[in-house]
A protein has these predicted regions:
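Short glycine-rich loop/turn motifs that provide flexible caps or phosphate-binding loops at active sites
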Residues: 7, 20, 41, 46-49, ...
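Helix N-cap/beta->alpha junction signal
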Residues: 85, 193-194, 280
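C-terminal alpha-helical cap/extension of soluble enzyme domains
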Residues: 8-14, 38-40, 202-205, 209-212, ...
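Active-site beta->alpha loop and helix N-cap motifs at the rims of alpha/beta catalytic domains
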Residues: 2-11, 16-148
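Short, amphipathic alpha-helical "lid/cap" segments that border enzyme active or binding sites
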Residues: 25, 29-32, 151, 284, ...
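Catalytic alpha/beta core domains of metabolic enzymes, predominantly
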Residues: 130-131, 142-250
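A general structural signal for well-ordered alpha-helical segments in protein cores
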Residues: 10, 28, 60, 64, ...
C-alpha cells in the first residue's frame, strides 16, 4: 500500500498573541477558518512561522486542539512536534495525534549537532515513526538549526514506512533532484519556500510548505496548477512575480514581516513573541509596497 505522502500547497500558519504576549486562541481560530475555506491543500501548525520554539508544552497542545477543531476536517492538519529529545518528540507526536492532527512535522534535533551523525538521525526519526500513530514528515531548516541532512541520510530515513516526506527549506536544486531520484516513489519531497517552488516541482517535488501561502495561497496554487497543466510559461511567470513578496515574509523581514502582511490582507497577524521584534513603520511600508506591486494586496 502506498504511503499517504503530502501533495500540494501547505501554509505554516502564524501563532497569534495578545498585546501582553499570551496565546490569542480566538484570533487563531478566526485565521484557521479563513485557511480552511481557502485554496490550500493543508495547514501546518507550529512550523517555524508558528514560533514553536517560543511556546510552552501546554501552549502547543492548546494550539493544536484549537486548530483541529476550527478546521473540522476540511483540510489535513500537520502539527510540528519536533523537540530536542527523541522521547519528548514521541510524547508530543502522540498527543498531537490524539488531538486530531493528520501528520507530524519533525524538525531535526540540533543543539548537540557536533555529536549527531547519520546513525543518530536515522535512529531518532525511525524511533519517532515507530511510535507515531500518524505519518511523519521530516523537517530540514538549516538556516535556523545549522543541520542540513545529507541525501544519504535522507534516503535511509525515508525507508521507514511511516515516514512519508520531507520539507527541505534549503533551495538546493541538485539536492532536491537527488532526494526525489533516490527515495521511494511514495515519499513526498516538499519545497520549504515559495522562492523555489516551480524548480522543485520540475524536479519531482510533490508540493511545498510555504510561508507565503499564508497570505497568497491562490498565487502559490497558481504555480502548482499551471505546472500540472503543462503551462510552464505561466508557472514560471508566477514564480518570478512571487520572488519579492516571498523574500519579504521570509529572509528579509522574517516572521514579523509575515505577520505584518497578514494584518494587511485582513487576517490576524499581530506582533511576534519577544525576543523577536515587530516591524517598524518604514519596514511595514516596504512590505505593503512589495505586496501591492505583486498583486497580493490591492493598492490603497
Amino acid at each position: 500500500m502506498a504511503r499517504p505522502y503530502p501533495v500540494g500547497v501547505f501554509a505554516p500558519v502564524a501563532t497569534t498573541f495578545t498585546s501582553d504576549g499570551a496565546l490569542d486562541l480566538d484570533r487563531f481560530r478566526a485565521n484557521m477558518e479563513w485557511y480552511a475555506t481557502s485554496s490550500l491543500d493543508g495547514i501546518v501548525i507550529m512550523g517555524s512561522n508558528g514560533e514553536y520554539v517560543s511556546l510552552s508544552p501546554d501552549e502547543k497542545l492548546a494550539l493544536i486542539e484549537a486548530g483541529v477543531k476550527a478546521v473540522d476536517g476540511r483540510k489535513p492538519i500537520v502539527a510540528g512536534t519536533g523537540v530536542e529529545s527523541t522521547r519528548g518528540t514521541i510524547e508530543l507526536t502522540k498527543a498531537a495525534a490524539e488531538l486530531g492532527a493528520n501528520y507530524a512535522l519533525v524538525v531535526t534535533p540540533h543543539y548537540y549537532k557536533p555529536r549527531y551523525d547519520k546513525a543518530a538521525y536515522v535512529r531518532h526519526f525511525h524511533a519517532v515513526a515507530d511510535a507515531s500513530p500518524i505519518p511523519v514528515i521530516v523537517y530540514v531548516m538549516a538556516a535556523y538549526t545549522g543541520v542540513d541532512l545529507p541525501v544519504d541520510t535522507v534516503v535511509e530515513i525515508a525507508q521507514h514506512p511511516n515516514i512519508v516526506g520531507i520539507k527541505d527549506s534549503g533551495g538546493n536544486a541538485p539536492k532536491v533532484a537527488e532526494m526525489v531520484a533516490r527515495t521511494p516513489e511514495d515519499f513526498g519531497v516538499l519545497a520549504g519556500s515559495a522562492n523555489f517552488l516551480y524548480p522543485a516541482l520540475c524536479l519531482g517535488a510533490t508540493g511545498g510548505i510555504l510561508a507565503l501561502a499564508n497570505v497568497a495561497p491562490d498565487a502559490c496554487q497558481e504555480i502548482v496548477q499551471a505546472f500540472r497543466a503543462g503551462d510552464h510559461e505561466r508557472a514560471r511567470a508566477t514564480q518570478f512575480r512571487l520572488l519579492a513578496p516571498n523574500a519579504a515574509v521570509t529572509t528579509r523581514f522574517g516572521i514579523a514581516g509575515l505577520k505584518a502582511a497578514m494584518d494587511m490582507i485582513g487576517l490576524h497577524g499581530g506582533d511576534p513573541r519577544p525576543p523577536l521584534l515587530p516591524l517598524n513603520d518604514a519596514e511595514r511600508a516596504e512590505v505593503r509596497r512589495i505586496m501591492e506591486e505583486a498583486g497580493i494586496l490591492a493598492r490603497a
